[in-house]
């Protein structure tokens, strides 16, 4: 058995342990309860609403129409690419498909996440330790929140849980798209100024298209970071690199355009009141300025100031933190991602007159800052204190 196979088996075991516990405990308490009711009871509070959307989409019903007396006249504008995989197999397994896909997609999320941090840290031992430690940290926070009423735990948990948990559909589905984007960007970056296989642009384009439809706010930060990083990384050679990979960039452009067009079509042909019933609202230019001021004030929150200060200190002290030169490019990408997460909401406000759940932008800010600092911290901890004491791979 080679390292990659062993690597995959470890992720399978980790996934099974994390997801099966709730079902095993439930069966030990109430063995006779049907698995169908366990799926409903052990899921998040909004699961049933999303499950009904999946059932509707599986029958090619984009109206998600549940009322006989008051049928919908147009389609709904909810992001269908976050449901598409569940809808594809719903007719085969019904509600039991949610269990199968919960295990499979969470495995895929952990697997791709590990691939991403292996790229960044260039060491499978450190990467696997980073993954396990992060999962343990998240589970510990959830446990403490269930037993102690500590507000600061909620502030720590939220950005992690919104990007790295098995809640359906976000982040169970959307984070697979997100980390796929990071992975394929890193594959392209690795080539330096040389020809990149078009398949990486194709896969990156599909990942972008799916994320644009499923979690538009996060896709803005991803796209903005990609553009900024290519400019800063390749500098004067940027046009040479684009010309060298022109067909790949054309593929990427049209797939991103496809993702944007799905949102446009859904918005154009959807029920006009659905957006407002989901908590959205229209804003004027004056209200945009007011929202921008609120975002600016948030910069002075203690946790945000700490993330900014530590991120810049890390960026300026790579050598002292024992980050190898060959790995610094990938850490830089995470640093720029953190910076772009501050700019993304302003760009969105500039072009959009409709907003909904703007707090998701701030979730991205907190997660990206934490993610950058966390990986540097684990790299430093492992190389200085744990490298000869812990072996996760062999």
Label the predicted regions.
Residues 220-222, 354-385:
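Hydrophobic/aromatic-rich transmembrane helices and adjacent perimembrane loops
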Residues 199-216:
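Membrane-interface alpha helices of multi-pass inner-membrane proteins
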Residues 46, 213-326, 332-335, 339-346, ...:
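Transmembrane catalytic cores of multi-pass membrane glycosyltransferases
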Residues 1-33, 121-131, 249-252, 328, ...:
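Start-transfer (signal-anchor) and selected internal transmembrane alpha helices
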Residues 20-179, 213-220:
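Active-site lumenal/periplasmic loops and adjacent helix-entry segments of GT-C-fold
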Residues 42, 157-170, 284-302, 363:
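Short aromatic-rich membrane-water interface segments that cap or initiate transmembrane helices
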Residues 246-256, 379-394:
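Signature aromatic-anchored transmembrane alpha helix within multi-pass, membrane-resident enzymes
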Residues 173-200:
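Membrane-interface transmembrane helices that cradle and orient dolichyl/undecaprenyl
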């Amino acid at each position: 058995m080679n390292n990659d196979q062993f690597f995959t088996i470890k992720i399978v075991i980790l996934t099974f342990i994390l997801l099966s516990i709730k079902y095993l405990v439930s069966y030990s308490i109430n063995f006779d309860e049907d698995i169908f009711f366990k799926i409903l009871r052990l899921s998040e509070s909004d699961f049933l609403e999303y499950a009904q959307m999946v059932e509707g989409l599986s029958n090619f019903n984009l109206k998600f129409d549940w009322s006989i007396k008051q049928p919908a006249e147009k389609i709904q504008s909810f992001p269908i690419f976050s449901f598409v995989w569940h809808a594809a197999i719903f007719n085969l397994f019904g509600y039991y498909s949610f269990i199968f896909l919960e295990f499979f997609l969470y495995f895929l999320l952990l697997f791709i996440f590990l691939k991403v941090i292996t790229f960044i840290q260039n060491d499978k031992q450190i990467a696997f330790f980073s993954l396990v430690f992060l999962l343990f940290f998240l589970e510990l926070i959830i446990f403490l929140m269930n037993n102690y009423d500590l507000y600061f735990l909620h502030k720590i948990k939220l950005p992690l849980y919104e990007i790295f948990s098995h809640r359906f559909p976000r982040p169970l589905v959307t984070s697979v798209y997100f980390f796929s984007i990071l992975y394929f960007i890193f594959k392209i970056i690795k080539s330096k100024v040389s020809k990149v296989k078009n398949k990486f642009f194709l896969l990156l384009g599909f990942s972008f298209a799916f994320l644009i439809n499923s979690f538009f706010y996060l896709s803005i930060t991803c796209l903005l970071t990609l553009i900024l990083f290519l400019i800063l990384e390749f500098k004067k050679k940027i046009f040479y690199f684009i010309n060298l990979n022109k067909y790949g960039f054309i593929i990427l452009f049209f797939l991103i355009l496809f993702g944007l067009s799905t949102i446009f079509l859904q918005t154009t042909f959807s029920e006009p009141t659905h957006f407002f019933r989901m908590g959205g609202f229209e804003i004027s230019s004056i209200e945009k300025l007011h929202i921008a001021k609120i975002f600016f004030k948030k910069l002075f929150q203690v946790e945000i100031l700490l993330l900014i200060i530590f991120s810049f200190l890390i960026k300026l002290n790579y050598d002292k933190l024992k980050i190898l030169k060959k790995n610094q490019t990938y850490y830089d990408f995470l640093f720029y991602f953190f910076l772009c997460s501050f700019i993304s909401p302003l760009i969105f406000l500039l072009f959009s007159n409709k907003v909904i759940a703007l707090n998701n932008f701030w979730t991205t800010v907190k997660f990206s800052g934490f993610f950058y600092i966390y990986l540097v911290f684990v790299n430093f901890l492992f190389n200085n204190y744990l490298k000869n004491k812990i072996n996760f791979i062999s």
